[in-house]
A protein has these predicted regions:
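Helix-turn-helix
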Residues: 128
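Conserved catalytic-core motifs of GNAT/GCN5-like acyltransferases
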Residues: 119-123, 133, 138-153
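Acetyl-CoA-dependent GNAT
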Residues: 8-85, 90, 103, 109
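Residues forming the Rossmann-fold NAD(P)(H) cofactor-binding site
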Residues: 96, 100
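A short, internal acetyl-CoA/4′-phosphopantetheine-binding micro-motif in the GNAT/acyltransferase core
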Residues: 87-94, 122-123
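Conserved acyl-CoA
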Residues: 101-117
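Short, conserved catalytic or adaptor-binding loops enriched in Gly and charged residues
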Residues: 1-4, 46
Length: 158
């Protein structure tokens, strides 16, 4: 795999097989452990079928090694805000700029859609904190979920 892997966009012209492959990736044990949540196929289907949402993925020899789901419209977002809902890279592929390339692709889509801010919810104790900071995101607010998980809302102007 090259250092500058270009993310593939899964949109209405993609296939159901693409969505299923991304679903399987997000639900791999190593990925779920980092995300600390289960990804529902119906959520990915909405990202596949709605014009304000996108799935991006990177593959190596036909294997999905990284993926991102984002959306530009939601009742929980400000009018000018897009959000990266999920982003993950297989552990053995981290440190190669793949996550950064996925986030840049999401930011580009959000700008094309007319958004000026990108956000991401991140667990406060996550190893991904440094990743988000390296991309220019800053903590906008901190809170605790109903089940006691400490979270940070990272955001940046795009």
């Amino acid at each position: 795999m090259t250092q500058s892997a270009k993310p593939v966009v899964v949109e209405q012209t993609g296939s159901e097989e693409d969505v299923e492959r991304v679903n399987e990736f997000f639900n791999l044990r190593a990925i779920k452990r980092d995300l600390h949540q289960f990804t529902y196929r119906t959520t990915l289907d909405r990202a596949f079928t709605r014009g304000d949402r996108r799935l991006f993925y990177v593959e190596d020899d036909g294997d999905v090694v990284a993926a991102l789901m984002m959306w530009c419209e939601s009742r929980v977002l400000d009018a000018d805000e897009a959000q990266i809902r999920l982003v993950a890279v297989k552990p053995e592929y981290r440190g190669r700029g793949i996550g950064q390339a996925l986030c840049e692709a999401a930011e580009e889509f959000a700008v094309e859609y007319g958004e000026s801010k990108m956000s991401a919810d991140v667990m406060a104790e996550s190893q991904a904190i440094e990743f988000w900071e390296s991309l220019g995101y800053t903590v906008e607010k901190e809170w605790t979920t109903n089940n006691g998980r400490s979270m940070c809302l990272f955001s940046k102007a795009i």
